[in-house]
């Protein structure tokens, strides 16, 4: 018996000219997410998703590649102007911002939204290398 053909719905491209780029740079990875102004995700990429594994995920080059990948997908959805939010202490912060700028976006603003505790949780113990 022949199985009926299943039609796959093609994901429609949203036309979002203005959006936000969220860069989360941790010590182990960098995640770049492009959203519309209301916070709905349009595209995202991370250093791990870009093919880097282990300690190479935390490098500035990996962050640059992730930002380029996410920016390309966002531009396909019509994004031209972005505001950048940066969170975290990682080494990929500046590299990701530079990659977004080089991708041809008009950067409206750059804001650091790294959460700072008012003496909340106890931090991890100091590393002895």
From Swiss-Prot:
Gene Ontology molecular function: rRNA binding; structural constituent of ribosome
A Pfam family it matches: Ribosomal_S11
InterPro entries: Ribosomal_uS11 (IPR001971), Ribosomal_uS11_bac-type (IPR019981), Ribosomal_uS11_CS (IPR018102), Ribosomal_uS11_sf (IPR036967)
Record's signal peptide: none
Gene Ontology cellular-component annotations: ribonucleoprotein complex; ribosome
This protein's UniProt keywords: Ribonucleoprotein, Ribosomal protein, RNA-binding, rRNA-binding
Any single GO BP term: translation
Function: Located on the platform of the 30S subunit, it bridges several disparate RNA helices of the 16S rRNA. Forms part of the Shine-Dalgarno cleft in the 70S ribosome.
Family according to the record: Belongs to the universal ribosomal protein uS11 family.
Subunit architecture: Part of the 30S ribosomal subunit. Interacts with proteins S7 and S18. Binds to IF-3.
Protein's name in the database: Small ribosomal subunit protein uS11
Organism: Nitratidesulfovibrio vulgaris (strain ATCC 29579 / DSM 644 / CCUG 34227 / NCIMB 8303 / VKM B-1760 / Hildenborough) (Desulfovibrio vulgaris)
Taxonomic lineage: Bacteria, Pseudomonadati, Thermodesulfobacteriota, Desulfovibrionia, Desulfovibrionales
